[in-house]
Curated annotation (Swiss-Prot):
HAMAP family: UPF0229. It comes from the Bacteria. This is UPF0229 protein Sde_0732. Residues 58-69 have a biased composition (Basic and acidic residues). PANTHER family: UPF0229 PROTEIN YEAH. Residues 52-109 are annotated as: Disordered. InterPro entries: UPF0229 (IPR006698). Coiled coil: none annotated.
Amino acid sequence: MSYIIDRRLNSKKKSTVNRQRFLRRYKQHIKKAVSDAIDKRSIQDMDRGEKIGIPSKDISEPVFHHDSGGVDTRVLPGNDQFHSGDRIQRPPSGQGGGGSGKGASDSGEGMDEFVFQITQEEFLNFMFEDLALPNLVKRQLAGIEEFEMRRAGFSNEGSPGKINVVRSLRSANSRRIALTSKKRKQLKELEARIAQLQAEPIADSATELEELEAEAAKLRAKIKRVPWLDTFDLKYNLHVKHPIPHSRAVMFCLMDVSGSMDQATKDVAKRFFLLLFLFLQRNYEKIEVVFIRHHTSAKEVNEEEFFYSRETGGTIVSSALHLMDEIIRERYPPNQWNIYGAQASDGDNWNDDSTTCYKVLTENIMPKVQYFSYIEITPRDHQALWAAYESVLRDFPKSFAMRQLEGADEIYPVFRDLFQKQVA
């Protein structure tokens, strides 16, 4: 008889492989459902799972069967409504065909769509599947290599802190069974013979009984001498160093919080950066994020202050660009880091400052960055800042992008457009 021993590590999720295969098979259905969910949800509500419905007709399995061959005679009922070649109209919703939906019906039959739940991680994976930081170039400091420790099974040697208790006890039990099974079988036979002689004494049974008991005592002693746990049984969790092919990247997030930005515009900007921050956290382990808020002056802040501070003022966009340039020179050498920038504004700026923005971008920032994106959140006509940035776009068409947003419903499409994966 064959025995199958499941040695997979995910003992509590043994259907994981089947689930992954199912998700790959119905990828298009799931991506469409995720896209529909994104349209309905707010940005703050992105970080959870979703229920996915797949029509029953799409999950039916093809089968091989015998064709209805041969010759047969059938008598079919006639009708007084249709003739040969007529097309039968589809029954109204809720009657023929059955299926999911509201309302009752006294006719028709069908099958509801198959509904299942995808996890938060799966939802975000489908959401960001086709996105990436453009122009990501691998750069590392010469002579510096990073490693991570990965599980590599088990070893017979290791430090006491890495002992695998379950594996060690299992090995000890197997060894004891292997070394004592023959003796235990002999002992069992002797004990059965001793019990028989004690129950039914015969002539000269006393001598034989003493010999059997002596032999049984020897077997028990031999079995007892087999150690319960031996150094041979000890198993240790084995971890090996695995080199990490990584790219060092930093993303600068610049947001206008001046008085010209009303609350609705600030909310759209916050949502865009929340989505960007979530995307970076989900897709890149080795990336730093620098938050810069600006009005007449710019300041580097933490995540909490960036999104929720109430500070406001006038508008000098170049202050944020100057600060970004200073931080790059101080902390992020371009030959060691992949540098990215994302800026959100309503387009308003102080007189003559737009020319300064163009100069700072073209001379100081764009030669150092891999990619810089600018979104202007306004339904109005563009102003001088947009014109200045159009000049930057002409000078750096491959590493600079700019888009206009008029409302929150355009955030995700514009986001996907800016960070679409590029075909190599």
